[in-house]
Structure formats: C-alpha cells, structure tokens
Amino acid sequence: MTLLRGLLWMSLLWPWLAPAAPGSWSAEAPSVRVAVPGRLYHSEALLPPGDAAARGNYIQKVRWRYSTPPGRSLRAWLCQGDRCLPLSGNRGISEALQGPAWSPLSFRFQLPDGERRAVTVTDIQVLVNY
C-alpha cells in the first residue's frame, strides 16, 4: 500500500518536477519606415503564441531577419523589454537574449550618422528556440 501511495504522489508531482519541454515560436512584424536621423523607431511587439508562453520556458536562441533596400543600411537592435542586443546585420542568430520565452521581443532601428534618406524595413521576423 505504501508503494502504491508513493507512486500515486510521484505521478501527481511529476509534471511540476519535470523540466519544460523544448520548443520554438516565430513571429513577424509589419514594415517600419525609418525617416528622421537620430530618432529610434520601434517595430510592433513580436509575441509568442499562447502555448509557447507557458511560464518556466526560457529562450535558448533567437534567429532574426529583416530586409532593407539594396545598398541601404541601418543601426538595429533586437530587444526584450529594456534589454537590447545590437545587431551586426540584417540576419543572424544569438544566445544573448536568454530571458523568459513568454516575454515579447521587438526591433529598434535608427538611420546611421549622416544618412538623410528614409528607409523602409520589411520582412521583420524572429524565430525563438526555448
């Protein structure tokens, strides 16, 4: 009887003791027009779907991508709350944003020094592994 009772308790507690299952989520944001030098422009929030937003899941890797017209460049950051990662190019992968998988991400863009022509950023995407 004691063994049976112990197994019953283990089966009830197991979901709480087991680590969160790995997974991924992806999101896209609408285009952003970056027009005024020195001003930061923010993408819309990139939100996880409900099932990926389970508490206890933490980001392992983030892949990002955005597009600009040929020959145009921007300063860009990928952010989770106030914590921002400077991006070295319009696509890449990083393990630096290892915060909660349920927290939204966003991009920030800025025209480089001396640039006066507006740039429209398209194809704004993330793929989050948790």
Feature names for model-found ranges:
Residues R5-P15:
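Bacterial N-terminal signal peptides
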Residues M1-T2:
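N-terminal secretory signal peptides that target proteins for export/translocation
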Residues P19-Y130:
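Disulfide-rich extracellular domains of secreted proteins
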